[in-house]
Every structure is written in C-alpha cells, then in structure tokens.
Amino acid sequence: MNTIKILIGLLGIFLFSLSGIVSAQSDATTQLSQLLSNFRTYQAKFNQITFDGQDRVIQQSHGRVMIMRPGRFRWETDSPTKQIIITNGKTLWVYDVDLSQATQQPLAQKTNINPASLLSGSVKDLKQKFTITISPTSDAATFQLVPRLGKSLNFNWIRLKFSKKQLTEMTVLNNLDERSIFQFSQIKVNAPLSSTLFEFKPSRGIDVVKQ
C-alpha cells in the first residue's frame, strides 16, 4: 500500500502553521479547528521513511509538498522514483514520470472522505470524522487523529507534530501496521503560489488512465 496516497485528502486538511504554543487545558478539536484558519499556503521539503510491523525499513523517499487552501495540493517525490500527485480540489492526478503514465479520478472517490467539509475546519466536522487528542510540551504539540470511519480510510491514526510554530513531522499508521514518518524542512507558510501548480495537463505521449 502506498502511504502517500493515503495522505491525499489529509495533507491539504492539516498542513498549517501553529500560531502559538497550545495548552493542555484547551479542547484539542477546538484548537485544531482554530489553527486551520491560520494558513493559506504551505510549502516544504520532506523526507519519508516507512517501517513494517517489525520496525524494518521498507521504503524511503524525499521530495516537496505544496498546498493552497481550499483543497489544492501538489506532492512531488524525487526518489526512489519520480512521481507527482496533484489535485485542484476536484480531480486527482497521479503522474508516474518514469512510466509516462498518469491516473485521473475524482478526489472524493480516492479519499472516501469529503475534503471540502474538513477544510472548513469546523469543530462539528472534525468531531464527526475523528477522535482528536493533544500532547503538548513547553515548545511543541502533537495532535493524534483517529478516524471514526475505521478502515474505510486505510489508516489507524495520524499524528501531527508542531515545533517552533510550524508543522515539522507527520506520522501515519496504516491498516497493514506500517508506520510512515514524514519530516518537513525549509517550510514556507502563506508565501505566494500560482494556481497553475495545482492543475495537470498531460503532454503528448503520456498514457492517461481514468478511474
């Protein structure tokens, strides 16, 4: 299972800058909802490492991510193979550069979740979709989100770690007991991004598969 594809509907929801260190006394869901309104765009480089259930490394990759609210997302993997995942909030493209093949499908079909409702960041929507807890420290905070929809989302939980007012790490445990850690660096929040980055137009010679 490709953990990156699990994150398609989630990264655009949860990548944002922490506006201030959060307190343990506040409700975690309310805090998360409030934080969602603090960003318009997010850019970062990432390093990913995935472990199996016996903590053996089974995958490593690196690349960059770009997000523009509402709903636009671009994830570029440079290694071990070059892959670009793009959505404008409606259509999802997965372009395997080395294979010259692109897969096109509705975003909601892939995620089994309505990204538009979650991108609103409302407490009601978050409480309906996830059980959320928070583990704060003096200079950081980690949110854990457990989906109420169970296996329909293909993951057991996702953790978002914030330090120095920015999201610096995300961990996902999928239904195969595979744990993927994404570390973010060179982060830019609310810097200008062109909307064309979130549109994909296959060039001549690319095989397009519609699902």
Curated annotation (Swiss-Prot):
It comes from the Bacteria. Keywords: Chaperone, Periplasm, Protein transport, Signal, Transport. It holds the Pfam family LolA. GO terms for biological process: lipoprotein localization to outer membrane; lipoprotein transport. InterPro entries: LolA/LolB/LppX, OM_lipoprot_carrier_LolA-like, OM_lipoprot_carrier_LolA_Pbac. GO terms for cellular component: outer membrane-bounded periplasmic space. The keyword Phosphoprotein does not apply. Its main location: periplasm. Residues 1-24 form the signal peptide. It is found in: Periplasm. Participates in the translocation of lipoproteins from the inner membrane to the outer membrane. Only forms a complex with a lipoprotein if the residue after the N-terminal Cys is not an aspartate (The Asp acts as a targeting signal to indicate that the lipoprotein should stay in the inner membrane). Belongs to the LolA family. Monomer. This is Outer-membrane lipoprotein carrier protein. It comes from Coxiella burnetii (strain CbuK_Q154) (Coxiella burnetii (strain Q154)).
